[in-house]
Amino acid sequence: HFGSSVASYFIFLRWMYGINMILFGLTFGLVMVPEALMGKPYGSLPRKTVPRAEEATAMNFATLWDFSGFAQYSVLFYGYYNNQRTIGWLKFRMPLSYFLVGVGTIGYSFMIVIRTMARNANEDGGGDDTSFNFSWKMFTSWDYLIGNPETADNKFASITTSFKEAIVEEQESRKEENIHLTRFLRVLANFLALCTLAGSGYLIFFVVRRSQKFALEGLENYGWWERNEVNMVMSLLGMFCPTLFDVISSLENYHPRIALRWQLGRIFALFLGNLYTFIIALMDEINLKASVLFLFTIFNRHMCKDEDFQQLEEEKIVKYNMTIWEASLYNGTIPENSTAPPIQVDPADVPRGPCWETMVGQEFVRLTVSDTMTTYITILIGDFLRAVFVRFFNYCWCWDLEYGFPSYSEFDISGNVLGLIFNQGMIWMGSFYAPCLPAINVFRLHTSMYLQCWAVMCCNVPQERVFKASRSNNFYMAMLLFILFLSTLPAVYTIVSIPPSFDCGPFSGKTRMFEVISETLEHDFPSWFGKVFGYASNPGLILPFILLMVLSIYYLNATSKSYKEANLELKKKLQSVRSR
């Protein structure tokens, strides 16, 4: 009913659902379940216990909806996991498993996306034979084995839509246009699109600066909108800017398939700017959380000298002040060069440093949930209620609502595709800090499939100019691969460069997260294996190997192009022989 272009979106969504099922299986089976079954239970450690000051509101709906309270101190987030090398009677290596699953999900995603692109390119390599196109459709489209009336109606609609697509292709190939007017309108459209992108970027920058000011003054002093302003503004921009780009693209007079790619590119730039502005804001918030460590030094600061105080690192300051705090519980005093005796304290009463990894995971989960809710509300209001209004008020209105304003809505291919791609980018980027993200995304994709199918069939009308989509979804896959690469960079940066929080997460106590690999090689493998691994990871071997891979890719690409050219030549010869 709606053509191959709309069908390509749902095929892409189904493919994404399969990928996320694998990611969910890895994180759920190798990270969340082992920690829940074999790890220390809730309340045994400070990192697994809600602080005393938050216990009263830990089960409130508003707190849980914000993924704080008991949700924050659970297997859903990074900070809950303990740093023991082995847990349970199976001696399950939780830190190693957490690290390998985080790296493995990214590696698997790269492998499956590139493999799918290669398979699609291979299937599409023969090109499209347009000889006697309408004759082939007329005499070979019907399936004479159909015996069900509903199936026959669907097949009839499919054949009709394929004829419409072929007519559009034929019209576009014969179209004549005023080249000077077309160039002027396309330059104007690009200028308006750039102004829209710049305005959205400035708006996000302004909102991020406001959120940092709110964080410094204390978010508890502000309302719901101020606490969620960044997420809501990003969701609203993602909802309204694609519509504005769609209006701008009507000036350009491109082929519908090319217009869709321009639309995708503009929305891609919009979402990319939004995503990286959000990441920069998170990095600033991480630095802000790190500076909070110094607040621990206010208590009993007079107990250490100024020169000693300046020499202490941030984490040592927190640990030192915890020792002072434990001694002060019993009105005891300790010298500066000694440690406090072990004191039995309830984990809920122990002060703890900020866990920036959990904070990052919470932000990604909130953004994913708010984006999902915005999408569903948009479908409900923009599609369903609009269709109900047009359907029942058309009889008593001053003009024809079906063919005038507002009319029935069309399915927004570009906005939905880009929303799907960037949501997946957030899943890849945030799943290392929130193992629950793949599960949330599986639920989102599952409900979106049925909700959007229902909205398309019941509330939307086919596009005014139905066009034939490419037989391969490689344009979607290329954007997905680019987003995967960009989503990998922040995660790799935090793993390699930023020290993990010292009192939460499976890597606490280590200088860098990747040290879990060297620790495993040292304790669980013979010494010769560690030496071999060290030699294999030497840059002197890695760089030539990468160079060899690049040269191999260049050679295979050149060979593929030559095969395609030979294939086209053979097709031309076959056509010339057939015409004789």
Q: Each PLM stretch: what is its role?
A:
Residues 1-580:
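Transmembrane transport/permeation module of multi-pass membrane proteins
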